[in-house]
Amino acid sequence: ETADEYLSGNVRDKLRLANAVVKEHPELFADNVTALEQVQPKDLDASEIDVRIGTTWIEPEDYEAFIFELLDTPRRSRAVRSTYYSSGIQIHLNKYTMEWFIENKSYDKSSVAASKTYGTSRMDAYTIFETTLNLRTVTVRDRIEDGDGRYHYEINQKETMLAREKQNQMKEAFKEWIFAEPERRNKYVNYYNET
């Protein structure tokens, strides 16, 4: 590996490795540590980090906390997890497909916040949030009967526009929320700067 290649990429991990090895072989790796220290990127603060809904390094529990706070989800509908039992609205990331899904989202879809404030009559807020987690833009389609048991779907422009407006409101609310609480801000700023 050339010097340019060595001093690029994930230089934080390379420095950690070089620091571990230099203890046993200082004569071989002291120059590596010095060179890697000089190319370390500066840490960013929260205002310099752009986090979107759907970022996979945000923990599912934090996405749950956000949506529960935003929609004022009733306690009885919120996620409950233990070794032997789980219930309520829960957000999961499928590690194989890297798709997010919200389990039991129907528990609260009729609340005013879920159906009107951040949702529409055609698409509730939990469905909009799940679509947003998967980095997709919401689209509302109407089923059109063609006769003989056949049908097709057409985009409903008006309902799609309303749902996208709600989606954008959620995105803006998340940007304000994610770094608002100091402990959560520190956790994700540190994670971002270390990877």
Show where each model-derived region lies:
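Charged, low-complexity intrinsically disordered regions
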Residues: 1-191
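ASCE P-loop NTPase motor core, strongest for the SF2 helicase catalytic module
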Residues: 194-195
